[in-house]
Curated annotation (Swiss-Prot):
Listed GO biological process terms: thiamine biosynthetic process; thiazole biosynthetic process
Modified residues (2,3-didehydroalanine (Cys)): C225
Catalytic activity: [ADP-thiazole synthase]-L-cysteine + glycine + NAD(+) = [ADP-thiazole synthase]-dehydroalanine + ADP-5-ethyl-4-methylthiazole-2-carboxylate + nicotinamide + 3 H2O + 2 H(+)
Stated family: Belongs to the THI4 family.
Post-translational modification: During the catalytic reaction, a sulfide is transferred from Cys-225 to a reaction intermediate, generating a dehydroalanine residue.
Species per Swiss-Prot/TrEMBL record: Mycosarcoma maydis (Corn smut fungus)
Name the record gives this protein: Thiamine thiazole synthase
Length: 341
């Protein structure tokens, strides 16, 4: 039996969507507070004003108004926010571990709705460069199998491979991930808190995240009363990297709430670290799976430096752990109401 999924709108079956109809005069005041006004988003190309791709001084764009741009962006972003308000899995952090996790999870389970949060404008975390701002990306085997799968070329150096530029891996992975229908990415959006509730046994459980735009979060010391939003999800995955401005967020928040004790990341030992990170990727607190370097802050594993195999393997392991966890839960509209027997 297919497990229940979050109540996302299916554009193919939900009937007329925002943007299907022309906004009539006065309808902003007359419309319900629960429904967005409708508007005409399709702009027909007028005869005699057809776009021309001529680079000899006659290049001409199709006509558009500024309001078309604003409405096109706003309608889609707000529709995404409405859909993601109840998700099946939320991944905090879109670095190498988070992106790999989302790709693996979305591919394995297209029935699950996956929401990613990334505090930076540019997803990818530290995976745009190798070590010390150099371009090459080192990946130890067998994690290179993901490169083969997504079509990223590399130099085979025996026990490891080298991608000529880390950005090639990250951009390729993102292009495949974001093309998937069951994945939504909110970048420039950070996690400010976790939703923690008691489950049916009375135990504390992570059941979603509290979000805000990163620039708002950074301005909390300058302004007051800038409240966040929430995303409800039965499974949350922390992939925020090691300690930093937004790093290791999930485990640091649990620690500050007195719910766990951090192990703190140990000094570098590349050979030891990567295997420990992958093999120990798990649910560290009910409802929260932790992967990548965030796990090193929780468990006290050594740092691994500029070798990315551990991040890839940990992201994949987190995806498989998320599937097992999700399939073990009884879920009602994103909230855990029991365990399957």
């Amino acid at each position: 039996m297919t497990p229940p999924t979050a109540s996302f709108i299916n554009p193919a079956t939900a009937g007329p969507q925002p943007g299907s109809f022309k906004l009539s005069k006065g309808s902003l005041h007359a419309c319900s507070t629960t429904a967005a006004p409708k508007y005409e988003q399709y702009v027909p190309i007028k005869t005699g004003e057809e776009p021309i791709e001529d680079f000899n001084g006659h290049y001409r764009f199709a006509e558009i108004k500024e309001s078309h741009t604003s409405r096109a962006m706003t309608a889609r972003y707000m529709a995404d926010m409405m859909d993601a308000a109840v998700s099946d899995v939320v991944i905090i952090g879109a670095g190498s571990a988070g992106l790999t996790c989302a790709y693996t999870l979305a591919k394995q389970r297209p029935d699950l709705r996956i929401t990613m949060l990334e505090a930076s404008v540019a997803p990818g975390g530290g995976a745009w460069l190798g070590g010390q701002l150099m371009s090459g990306m080192v990946i130890r085997k067998p994690a290179h199998n993901l490169l083969v799968e997504i079509g990223v070329p590399f130099d085979d150096e025996g026990s490891y491979v080298v991608v000529k530029h880390a950005a090639l891996f990250t951009s390729t992975l993102m292009s495949k991930l974001l093309a998937m229908d069951n994945v939504k990415l909110f970048n420039a959006t950070c996690c400010e808190d976790l939703i923690i509730k008691k489950d049916q046994t009375g135990a504390q459980r992570v059941n979603g995240v509290v979000t805000n735009w990163t620039l708002v979060t950074m301005a909390h010391g300058l302004q007051s009363c800038m409240d966040p939003q929430t995303i409800t999800a039965p499974v949350v995955i922390g992939a925020c990297g090691h300690d930093g401005p937004f790093g290791a967020f999930s485990v640091k928040r649990l620690s500050s709430a007195g719910l766990i004790k951090l192990g703190d990341m140990r000094p570098m030992d590349m050979n030891k670290s990567e295997g420990l990170i992958v093999n120990n990727t798990r649910e560290v607190f009910p409802g929260l799976i932790v992967s990548g370097m965030e796990l090193s802050e929780h468990d006290g594993h050594p740092r691994m430096g500029a070798s990315f195999g551990g991040m890839i393997g940990s992201g994949q392991k987190a995806a498989y752990e998320a599937i097992k966890l999700y399939d073990s839960l009884e879920i009602d509209d994103g909230e855990v109401v029991g365990l399957k027997h």
